[in-house]
């Protein structure tokens, strides 16, 4: 099986703010070749399931695009919107990450994660095997305070 990642990155100044954007393509040779995420189709791909259970992979499909822009709101505050898209189905994950440096040894990190897509898609919710029931994480919020000493 083959896995492949390609990335392009560019930095610039816009509106007096430092910006850095990237576009990335990821190919997962272990992913579902037919784009079906129902329990029977997934069970027929044991190589994928083993790698998911071991934490070696985090995606079900084969083709993904990711785009993000890091915006330096101030020298201490960085805001980064990111979208992860499954190219083979109409689903994506939108993530907004913020980092604020409270001092030389303290940082506050937060993110909002919003899955986008209809039921039956990777980020919208994969089929559970029960009628009209999908396995999905839903929107999420994360916060972390880090103190370095």
Each predicted region: which residue ranges?
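Membrane-embedded beta-strand positions of outer-membrane beta-barrel proteins
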Residues: 21-23, 69, 81, 98, ...
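Extracellular loop and loop/strand-boundary signature of outer-membrane beta-barrel proteins
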Residues: 51-55, 82-84, 128-133
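Transmembrane beta-strands of outer-membrane beta-barrel pores
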Residues: 12, 25-31, 71, 83-89, ...
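Repeated loop/turn-to-beta-strand initiation elements of outer-membrane beta-barrel proteins
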Residues: 15-21, 75-79, 105-110
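Long, well-ordered mid-to-C-terminal structural blocks that present hydrophobic/aromatic surfaces
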Residues: 1-48
